[in-house]
Amino acid sequence: MSRQTPTTALALDDAGLLQADGTALKLPPKERAVLRLLLARAPGVVRKDEFAAQAWAGREMSDESLARCISRVRQLLQPRGVQVEAVYGLGYRLVDQAAPVPAAPSAQALDSHAHARQLMQQRTPAAMGLAIELLRDLVRESPSFGPARVALGDALAIAVGWGHLATPAAVAEGLAALDGLDAGLPGLHAVRGALLDMAWRFDEARRSFELALAADPDGTDTLLGFARHLLYTDDAAGAVARLRRVRELAPHALHVRMTLTRALVQGGHGAEAVAEAQATVRDNPGQLLTLAFSLAIQSMVAPQPELEAAALRLTQGLDTPPFVWTVASFVLSRLGRREATLDIVDTALLCSRTTAGEAALYAAPLAALGEHDRAAALLRAAVDERCGMMAMVLRDPAHAHWLPQHPAGRALLHDVFGEASLA
């Protein structure tokens, strides 16, 4: 005698074994335990801590390992007309695939989503933080509004890339937001790829971007995300080719032009990178970010004495952003101004509230001064915290000459990129 669940294709027999249409299911232990919990609770929600306590038997369970397990259970259940639905912020539950179509988002939800996207376009930490909070509220209030969940994943990936959020928690939140969405939803695969890149799961990210490109080969966000993936995986030439196409499609997007400039340097096209950076400044007068970025690129490619005065002028504002001090210290280091460089670096690290990821940006000026051990220590602290931004930082051309030659540098490359990075 078996006990039938609300999802009638599945059942538990008297011995507690799983059956589908009268046939016993053969599953690995974790998947079997997860599905048993879902069946026992159906149609209710199983919380994540319940999975950890029973399926993981009290051992540590990461959000990512649970998500992978759920994905395998989904593959098993889909042909049987049953799906595992993610309930944002709570857990998972079993539902029949013939569930009612959710109601369309309200006008207020659409307006909140549009506002969050506008904030994200500002590309500032404050605006991105506000966008994330707005999207979190929106997803809680309208969990069936797929574009809002995609936008939340996108915003979290961007914030992680800047070093402003703890990577493991943010990536897990972003992947959970995408969980269970229609595979055809615009931007879904590209955002998942960006999140996986921040978790250093580059092979999985590559597969996500392949799906994204198949669905939207000329989408600017898709191409930009894939280009970044290529930079992380040390294919600067491939990244430059994609970014040139994105620049054609979105010629005025600052983040596109800055990423192209960075890719040109990484690919060995220094003079072209300087020209692109200077053109971006001319096309966007008064932008502190583009000016600072241009000075950093010029000092990396061809340091000139006149760059010092320009860099120091950036620091004279009443409320100088942290990135200005990073750029100023790098410019000074490339000009051999050791004492002035260390004054900025030491002050920033000792007297400012910086995350491990933000502190790692000072490794570049230290490396330029030959302080490789100290630079490696900053990078190691960020890698040990699994800061997603390190995928880009360790590919910085400022580190290309010393990281592969330094014992600590080789260990860093291995920990983030794997054995292939040392070949």
Say what each PLM segment does.
Residues 2-12, 25-26, 38-39, 61, ...:
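DNA-binding patch around the recognition helix
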Residues 23-55:
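Short amphipathic alpha-helical recognition elements used for nucleic-acid or partner binding
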Residues 96-136, 140, 150-173, 420:
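Amphipathic helix-loop-helix modules that constitute alpha-helical solenoid scaffolds
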Residues 120-121, 157, 161-164, 197, ...:
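Specific register positions within alpha-helical solenoid repeats of the TPR/Sel1-like families, i.e.
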Residues 127-133, 162-177, 199-211, 233-245, ...:
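Structural signature of tandem alpha-helical TPR/SEL1-like repeats
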Residues 139-140, 179-183, 213-214, 245-248, ...:
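Conserved structural position within tetratricopeptide repeats
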Residues 240-242, 253-423:
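Alpha-helical protein-protein interaction modules
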